Amino acid sequence: MEKLMKYASFFYTAVGIRPYTNGEESKMNKLIFHIVFWSNVINLSFVGLFESIYVYSAFMDNKFLEAVTALSYIGFVTVGMSKMFFIRWKKTAITELINELKEIYPNGLIREERYNLPMYLGTCSRISLIYSLLYSVLIWTFNLFCVMEYWVYDKWLNIRVVGKQLPYLMYIPWKWQDNWSYYPLLFSQNFAGYTSAAGQISTDVLLCAVATQLVMHFDFLSNSMERHELSGDWKKDSRFLVDIVRYHERILRLSDAVNDIFGIPLLLNFMVSSFVICFVGFQMTVGVPPDIVVKLFLFLVSSMSQVYLICHYGQLVADASYGFSVATYNQKWYKADVRYKRALVIIIARSQKVTFLKATIFLDITRSTMTDLLQISYKFFALLRTMYTQ
């Protein structure tokens, strides 16, 4: 099971978080994680605070475009910070969830083959690795874009004067461009960008690992039901049904636990992402220079890839849970006792109530959620365009 969790554990360690306990920790390890976490949080809070001050001052000076740009950065900070704190808050619940998943995790070659574990493990690992690398490359390219511009245009090609710039707009009450303070500010902003990105990647990849296991258990349940050969003996067949129902109920409880842990951060993620996509798209359509368009495009891709990843796994869970009702109907139930057939009707009725990944009670997450999000973003985009032209 650690193979499924390795990418999430790596990025959580980078921001000083242990999402679940795995035995006793030494005092030194706890201290190190504590220092790393609060160093990340304090720096990220500092950058977010001064970005907020910049937004206020930009609105006061009628610098609408700059204010919108800074708002998209604040949204990025908000999502990262919220995911980090919610995971720390839900550490006990996550530990209980992971322990229960370990209890039903298929160990041994025979069980691994029955559950088709290598396929699920390989798919989850590939998606997690590609997503982590994509998001990391996009964010670090965004963070270092201003430095690359300075060295390429100003120092190497000498075709235009760029000057020293910072990756994110924030209020700084002194002249920092030709001052030694530029370098600490550059480090602070890059550190904050890395913190927010790592906080988001780790939580997204953890959700993928947990959702993959839910899908695996739903699929195993469906295969077991569909391929089971009935004996026609009510006592023997009813024992099989009892085991299936208990297994199904356990998976449903695990699904509820996942929604309880991730529901609020997912809701906040979708709300903020709709604004971020809107803000970034707006900036790309108001005549900014081509190099800035490239920078904004990277930011847009990172936000949309995150939303699609969550929606994709939400769809997989929904399809797998509904597939159990189809598998139950496809069983050779016509050979069974009439009492067995009546029991199957109840099981089918229950399994047709689809299990979703939920952003609290407000949103069932599937691929169609991506469409809804883009529609909301476009509405805000149209509103911003109207305000800007007026």
UniProtKB/Swiss-Prot annotation:
Subcellular location: Cell membrane
GO annotation, biological process: detection of chemical stimulus involved in sensory perception of smell; signal transduction
Keywords carried by this UniProt record: Cell membrane, Glycoprotein, Membrane, Olfaction, Receptor, Sensory transduction, Transducer, Transmembrane, Transmembrane helix
Residue intervals on the Cytoplasmic side: 1-30, 88-126, 222-260, 313-360
GO cellular component terms, semicolon-separated: cation channel complex; dendrite membrane; plasma membrane
Assigned protein family: Belongs to the insect chemoreceptor superfamily. Heteromeric odorant receptor channel (TC 1.A.69) family. Or49a subfamily.
Miscellaneous comment in the UniProt entry for this protein: The atypical heteromeric and topological design of the odorant receptors appears to be an insect-specific solution for odor recognition, making the OR/Orco complex an attractive target for the development of highly selective insect repellents to disrupt olfactory-mediated host-seeking behaviors of insect disease vectors. Odor-evoked OR currents are independent of known G-protein-coupled second messenger pathways.
Name by which UniProt lists this protein: Odorant receptor 85b
UniProt organism field: Drosophila melanogaster (Fruit fly)
Lineage, broadest ranks: Eukaryota, Metazoa, Ecdysozoa, Arthropoda, Hexapoda
